[in-house]
Design a protein with these regions (language model features):
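Active-site-adjacent structural segments surrounding the nucleophilic cysteine of cysteine proteases
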Residues: 2-4, 12-22, 26-155, 162, ...
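A short acidic/basic microdomain associated with nuclease active sites
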Residues: 83-84, 167-170
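Structural recognition of the beta-strand scaffold that forms the well-ordered cores
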Residues: 93, 168-169, 189-194, 225, ...
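A mature extracytoplasmic/lumenal domain signature
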Residues: 98, 173, 194-198, 228-230, ...
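...with weaker cross-activation on analogous glycine-rich loops/strands in unrelated enzymes
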Residues: 158, 162, 172-195, 199
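Short, basic, glycine/proline-bearing loop/turn elements
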Residues: 160-167, 211
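Noncatalytic regulatory segments and standalone regulatory/sensor domains
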Residues: 204-211, 215-218, 224-269
Length: 269
């Protein structure tokens, strides 16, 4: 009897130990599974936060000018801009008058003659300067030549330096006309270089510069502001400082824009 009971007791003890061991293993498995799930969830959340932060950072650091130039170009868009006329005061001042048009549109109450007198870099011609460096002559003189985009950018920056409400100024020369349309589509009129009535320019050598290069001036050189376009009608709307608010054929406008070096100046926020 005693031997039988002793054997049963040993079997019972063994079963109990096995049962306890199984419970421990099962519990450990549950704990490990829970920890893995917790870490996995944390990693997913962390990755999501990191992606979101990266996207927000990229958006915050993207150049505003790049955003404007890469904007969508719908089939048509028009900005209500009133043209400022250059005559009679500034017979050759189409460039500074075009800048005046854009500044007036943005709420700056400035006069074209004020800009010409106090902000436009002017030099006499003859070889020391080019139209990329200064206005050659004076816009009050009908025999003066004019200037190109960098000079108008410089005048705009000088003016902005004295204003409490400032805008950015960019020489966007070299960009395609489609980029110019992108600016207009987002509400930004653009100063561009063209010719009077879109005449075909002819290049005349005026003098030889000190470094031996020849200075060539394009006949009919002109500057205006594009404030609208319509691809369906093949037209562009411009503020022409000689003609006022005018409509030109788009194909011809684009052709002359390229021939004049795809020059443009943008004021933007």
């Amino acid at each position: 009897m005693d031997n039988h009971k002793s054997g049963s007791k040993k079997k019972n003890n063994g079963s109990c130990l096995l049962f306890v061991l199984l419970i421990i293993i099962f519990a450990a498995a549950i704990v490990l599974a829970w920890k893995f799930r917790d870490k996995s969830g944390t990693a997913d959340v962390s990755a999501t936060v990191q992606i979101t932060q990266t996207t927000e950072t990229e958006s915050e650091t993207k150049d505003p000018l790049e955003i404007i130039l890469s904007g969508d170009v719908p089939s048509s868009h028009n900005i209500n801009v009133e043209a400022v006329l250059q005559n009679p005061e500034l017979p050759t001042g189409c460039e500074i008058t075009s800048l005046t048009t854009v500044l007036n549109y943005w709420g700056y109450n400035v006069d074209k003659c004020d800009l010409a007198d106090n902000y436009l870099h002017k030099e006499s011609g003859g070889g020391e300067y080019t139209m990329y460096e200064a206005f050659l002559g004076t816009p009050y003189d009908s025999n003066a030549l004019g200037c190109y985009a960098p000079v108008i950018k410089d005048a705009a920056e000088k003016y902005m330096a004295r204003q409490s409400k400032k805008m950015q100024v960019a020489d966007i020369s070299g960009n395609s006309v489609e980029k110019v349309y992108a600016c207009v589509a987002q509400g930004y009129p653009v100063v561009i270089w063209s010719t009077m009535n879109l005449h075909e320019p002819s290049w005349t050598t005026y003098w030889t510069n000190e470094d031996g290069t020849k200075f060539e001036f394009p006949s009919y050189e002109h500057c205006m502001v594009i404030n609208g376009y319509n691809k369906n009608d093949n037209t562009v709307e411009v503020c022409d400082p000689m003609e006022g608010n005018t409509t030109y054929e788009m194909d011809r406008f684009e052709e002359i824009y390229k021939e004049m070096g795809s020059q443009a100046v943008l004021l933007y926020k």
